[in-house]
């Protein structure tokens, strides 16, 4: 994992550098700590808490231009929002899933995949790998635990890992959303609709 060489990553508001995964992880926790992040109403996702740290760290790694960074962020937002809508917001939430976490890795994989120049097959694999690591439960509400900040942070690492592993040749499941055995739409929602991914 070449990106974990201890340089290239910057934790916002700090001195020095670390690896891009650690920087993106901590930056995502910081972004979600005060609960002031954005929301996409139709998917109930907070895209920026994971997307910006992931894309920013990856952009630094590949020395991307500002335009390339913004293009990647747009790709990530489009992905996280569409996956969130496809999962069926109300049913997904009633089953205890946190859409920022379950969908965030997809957005991060798309953004980082764009910055890494993944081809179509590699990007499909990256999305599949991000989906197979999807998680995030609302159980923290029961006792007021502070672990909710881990949700966008893990989404960042899952998306980064997925994009870099796809670039290195690892494959992910093409039908991660709609697979009969283990597809996320059936596992995470009673009202999942694959058509919303492309509408």
Question: For each predicted feature, which ranges?
Answer:
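N-terminal core-entry segment
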Residues: 1-198
């Amino acid at each position: 994992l070449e990106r974990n060489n201890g340089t290239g990553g910057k934790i916002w508001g700090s001195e020095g550098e670390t690896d891009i995964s650690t920087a993106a992880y901590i930056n995502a926790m910081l972004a979600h700590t005060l609960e002031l992040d954005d929301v996409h109403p139709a998917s109930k996702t907070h895209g920026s808490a994971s997307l910006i740290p992931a894309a920013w760290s990856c952009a630094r790694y590949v020395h991307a231009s500002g335009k390339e960074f913004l293009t990647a962020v747009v790709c990530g937002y489009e992905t996280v929002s569409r996956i969130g809508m496809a999962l069926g917001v109300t049913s997904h939430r009633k089953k205890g899933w946190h859409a920022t976490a379950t969908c965030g890795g997809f957005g991060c994989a798309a953004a980082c995949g764009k910055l890494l120049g993944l081809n179509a097959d590699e990007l499909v694999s990256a999305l599949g790998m991000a989906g197979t690591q999807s998680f995030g439960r609302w159980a923290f509400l029961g006792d007021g635990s502070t672990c909710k900040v881990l949700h966008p942070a893990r989404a960042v690492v899952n998306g980064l890992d997925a994009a870099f592993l796809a670039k290195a040749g690892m494959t992910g499941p093409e039908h991660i959303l709609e697979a009969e055995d283990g597809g996320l739409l059936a596992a995470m929602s009673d009202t999942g609709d694959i058509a919303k991914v492309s509408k």
